[in-house]
Design a protein with these regions (language model features):
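Acidic catalytic motifs of isoprenoid enzymes
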Residues: 1-183, 190, 194-231, 239-252, ...
């Protein structure tokens, strides 16, 4: 359910692209250092966005280093780390753990059992350190599980579960920016959930799996409705972002919010157009 909140590379200046990659590689290294290969496998662009956002807002002191890794064994890569990197790594692992645990409980996925088992002890320590975030993740995933069992087609209800989860993860400190960050995370979380459901719909229909968009899909204006909902979520999220006094890396953040979040949507539209053209060609033969 991740990977939607990323950069639009063609629209990003080279210096900003290098810096984004340095934040991303810094998170990857922190996950490997603290949680091993399994932790590293939880790496997402979405949490990289959270690092850049919170680092900009709280003016975190960045540490720039150069390191090699398995992906780049020859040339050293620039890596940025700060106090937010640690927080994002912890949240990444905590969310992955509860998600794997939920996968095993609901669908008996072996990957959930094995992955959750490997992360269990470390995730429990993180949960003790961050009880508010841990509670939010558990409760949100439980409600999402309930939505699936009930085959709920209330999009706002199911998306709201993930929205509340992300809202709590975005709140690094309970201070004057808490409510703005909470609203920003809420709408971004809803966007991620709906985008994921939209991307998975065809497969879910074939496999008869739960998807909150099945009823909406029956409408003639389904595509237009989805685009309007997604636009609304990102518009609300971006409006909250603009209330924050972020100056550092603001061009990267705006690139993600105004362009990058649409990468996967645009790919889906391109694929649907190509499939439609191919079908028309076959019918005309």
């Amino acid at each position: 359910m991740f990977g939607y909140v990323t950069i639009c590379e063609p629209e990003l200046k080279m210096k900003d692209l290098r810096k984004y990659k340095a934040y991303y590689c810094g998170l990857c290294r922190k996950l490997k250092e603290d949680y091993g290969t399994m932790g590293q496998m939880t790496l997402t662009d979405d949490m990289t966005f959270a690092i850049i956002l919170l680092s900009s807002l709280y003016e975190a002191k960045n540490r720039m280093n150069q390191h090699r890794c398995k992906v780049h064994p020859v040339k050293k890569q620039a890596m940025i780390e700060n106090e937010i990197t640690q927080y994002a790594a912890d949240m990444n692992v905590l969310l992955a753990y509860y998600h794997m645990k939920d996968d095993w409980a609901d669908e008996k996925k072996v990957s959930g059992l094995l992955g959750g088992g490997l992360l269990k002890k470390k995730a429990e320590k993180i949960a003790e350190q961050y009880p508010r975030q841990s509670k939010a993740i558990r409760e949100s995933l439980q409600e999402l599980s309930d939505c699936e069992k009930e085959n709920s087609q209330e999009i706002d209800r199911s998306a709201g579960c993930f929205g509340r989860l992300m809202a709590d993860l975005f709140v690094y400190k309970e201070d004057m920016w808490e409510q703005t960050l909470r609203r920003m995370g809420f709408f971004l979380g809803k966007y991620i959930y709906i985008m994921d459901a939209y991307e998975d719909l065809e497969e879910d229909l074939r496999k008869q799996c739960y998807n909150p968009l099945k009823r909406l899909h029956e409408r003639a204006d389904y595509e237009e409705q989805i685009r309007q909902i997604l636009c609304m979520m990102i518009a609300e999220c971006s409006a909250e972002f603009e209330k924050l006094p972020c100056l550092l890396d603001v061009d990267i953040l705006r690139n993600i919010l105004y362009d990058g979040v649409w990468n996967r949507y645009n790919k889906i539209q391109k694929k649907k157009l190509e499939e439609g053209n191919k079908k028309n060609e076959q019918e005309s033969l």
